[in-house]
Amino acid sequence: MTTMTASQVIGLLNLEPHPEGGWYRQSFADRPDSAGRPLSTAIYYLLEGGKRNAWHRVDATEIWHWYGGDPMRIETSHDGVHRIEALLGPDLMSGERPQFVIPASHWQRTSCLGDWSLIGCTVTPGFQFSRFELAEPGWEPG
């Protein structure tokens, strides 16, 4: 496999800046339910080294999938007080996992543990920016 830079991946996948930080592009939107919300959506998401996205939550279950680059740390909080961490990546022997589920309404943020991380995120019911909540700057669980 050829080693690519984050800029090359961003260009090849036509990614755009995401409001929470990082780069993304929606790759799939399922048919809508009776209220017009897609049954599910999927995105590519890239986070560059030394960066982490802002704490945020959505009203739907998210399934994160590792695709390439370096591992990614995912932090979540179900109650805004307690925090858990998981590693998304290919090295199963070191505790990384290629998939991680974040239940609806859980606070979350991610950080890249190398040069860049490319993941996919499948959301059900489908992601809508109107149901996305960004935490106040500086907010941390606890």
Label for each model-derived stretch:
Residues T2-V101, W107-T110, G114-S117, C121-G142:
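Non-catalytic, conserved peripheral segments adjacent to functional cores
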